């Protein structure tokens, strides 16, 4: 283990460098159970406060590189209507998205997040929590550990991910709003469950769970079959999330909820 990892991750609480430790075995078991039941697991205060300050500073130095965009999309990440479907079909329900991305290549090679992302310790720990092996670092130099930036009034509407799983690290939370909401396993392979999806899109909250992330928290999430969103950011502070991307195929092309200068998705 490189000594630098010890300055980024709270290894006393989460010794991810030792997957055979009782602490990590219990944590992995907990994460697997939560992912199986809710498609979501959170590890609080994973990042040390001083490292969090470094990450925040590195991001804010590059804010002029953030690509912000607005568009109207449906829950399936498409912006084009399909008039062949019934008027009330969930694929014809379009919602406002306003957010931006800061590409991975905006950061120096020795940046805090780049170092953490490239450690074997984090990759193997995430693989254990997911119960999936092998997983890989994404070969895309622009998006492998990009930041999702949501300025005041930023919003991510209800949607499904195009990938099996995602990681998120909360770097800065807004003064109000910016809450992660999700409906676990609302659809399944071979069953889109359009009626239940339609209910959620129209305001039914009977299946909705909320997750109030704090800076330093690590979230592991399976979003392909779980409808989810981030509520509107309120106040003066932006919401910063880093999205370290581990994938089943390092050369895959993923569909994102917003484009970048390279026209993602």
Labelled PLM ranges:
Residues 47-50, 54-66, 84-140:
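Signature of the catalytic double-stranded beta-helix
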